[in-house]
Amino acid sequence: MHAGEAVQQLKKAFETVASFDFRDALSKASTPVTVVATNGPFGLAGLTCSAVCSVCDRPPTVLLCINRKSYAAGIIKSNGVLSVNWLAAGQAVISQTFAGVGSVPMEERFADKGWQTIATGAPYRMDAAVSFDCTIANIVDVGSHSVIFAEVVARNHAEECTPLIYHRRQYATTRSLAE
């Protein structure tokens, strides 16, 4: 077997890992629970997003990955602004609502007074562990998802809170090892 055949066999082996095995492996990694929201000329929308992380602090930038087929994806990209809200321990219902559980209409998802705006007009959750108000800096499409790079223009955070995380396909919280 020559090197080209070996590379092709490796590629094929990795392709078989894809969908189910990939998602199953990632379910064992804990992730913060976030809701991404937008409002602007193209409408009001939001979704629960598990793929969010920091990129750099100069300029302060985060990235998030959203399925291009989701209702909110096109609205978020068209508005050009968004908020990223890392939820606190008692906010699993908010996560479920924005994930589509219960088929709550989009406008009703934002009906309670916990949603406000800072700079861009994108709604942020006042009682979230952390909320960033952002403008979209870049979008890269990869497979089924859009990777959105968003520059942070304002922030809000709770003084004391326990974050909500998702681990092994269920909600959980963190606990300090020093206790």
UniProtKB/Swiss-Prot annotation:
<dbReference type="GO" id="GO:0006208">
    <property type="term" value="P:pyrimidine nucleobase catabolic process"/>
</dbReference>
<dbReference type="GO" id="GO:0004497">
    <property type="term" value="F:monooxygenase activity"/>
</dbReference>
<dbReference type="InterPro" id="IPR012349">
    <property type="entry name" value="Split_barrel_FMN-bd"/>
</dbReference>
<feature type="binding site">
    <location>
        <position position="99"/>
    </location>
    <ligand>
        <name>FAD</name>
    </ligand>
</feature>
<keyword id="KW-0547">Nucleotide-binding</keyword>
<comment type="function">
    <text>Reductase component of a two-component system that degrades 2,4,5-trichlorophenol. TftC provides the FADH(2) required by TftD. TftD oxidizes 2,4,5-trichlorophenol (2,4,5-TCP) to 2,5-dichloro-p-benzoquinone, which is chemically reduced to 2,5-dichloro-p-hydroquinone (2,5-DiCHQ). Then, TftD oxidizes the latter to 5-chloro-2-hydroxy-p-benzoquinone.</text>
</comment>
<keyword id="KW-0058">Aromatic hydrocarbons catabolism</keyword>
<feature type="binding site">
    <location>
        <position position="166"/>
    </location>
    <ligand>
        <name>FAD</name>
    </ligand>
</feature>
<dbReference type="GO" id="GO:0016646">
    <property type="term" value="F:oxidoreductase activity, acting on the CH-NH group of donors, NAD or NADP as acceptor"/>
</dbReference>
<comment type="pathway">
    <text>Xenobiotic degradation.</text>
</comment>
<feature type="binding site">
    <location>
        <begin position="104"/>
        <end position="109"/>
    </location>
    <ligand>
        <name>FAD</name>
    </ligand>
</feature>
<dbReference type="GO" id="GO:0010181">
    <property type="term" value="F:FMN binding"/>
</dbReference>
<keyword id="KW-0520">NAD</keyword>
<keyword id="KW-0285">Flavoprotein</keyword>
<feature type="binding site">
    <location>
        <begin position="65"/>
        <end position="71"/>
    </location>
    <ligand>
        <name>FAD</name>
    </ligand>
</feature>
<keyword id="KW-0560">Oxidoreductase</keyword>
<dbReference type="InterPro" id="IPR050268">
    <property type="entry name" value="NADH-dep_flavin_reductase"/>
</dbReference>
<keyword id="KW-0274">FAD</keyword>
<feature type="binding site">
    <location>
        <position position="145"/>
    </location>
    <ligand>
        <name>NAD(+)</name>
    </ligand>
</feature>
<comment type="similarity">
    <text>Belongs to the non-flavoprotein flavin reductase family.</text>
</comment>
<feature type="binding site">
    <location>
        <begin position="54"/>
        <end position="57"/>
    </location>
    <ligand>
        <name>NAD(+)</name>
    </ligand>
</feature>
<feature type="binding site">
    <location>
        <begin position="48"/>
        <end position="51"/>
    </location>
    <ligand>
        <name>FAD</name>
    </ligand>
</feature>
<dbReference type="GO" id="GO:0042602">
    <property type="term" value="F:riboflavin reductase (NADPH) activity"/>
</dbReference>
<feature type="binding site">
    <location>
        <position position="144"/>
    </location>
    <ligand>
        <name>FAD</name>
    </ligand>
</feature>
<comment type="subunit">
    <text>Homodimer. The chlorophenol-4-monooxygenase is composed of an oxygenase component TftD and a reductase component TftC.</text>
</comment>
<protein>
    <recommendedName>
        <fullName>NADH:FAD oxidoreductase</fullName>
        <ecNumber>1.5.1.37</ecNumber>
    </recommendedName>
</protein>
<dbReference type="Pfam" id="PF01613">
    <property type="entry name" value="Flavin_Reduct"/>
</dbReference>
<keyword id="KW-0503">Monooxygenase</keyword>
<feature type="binding site">
    <location>
        <begin position="166"/>
        <end position="169"/>
    </location>
    <ligand>
        <name>NAD(+)</name>
    </ligand>
</feature>
<dbReference type="InterPro" id="IPR002563">
    <property type="entry name" value="Flavin_Rdtase-like_dom"/>
</dbReference>
<dbReference type="GO" id="GO:0042803">
    <property type="term" value="F:protein homodimerization activity"/>
</dbReference>
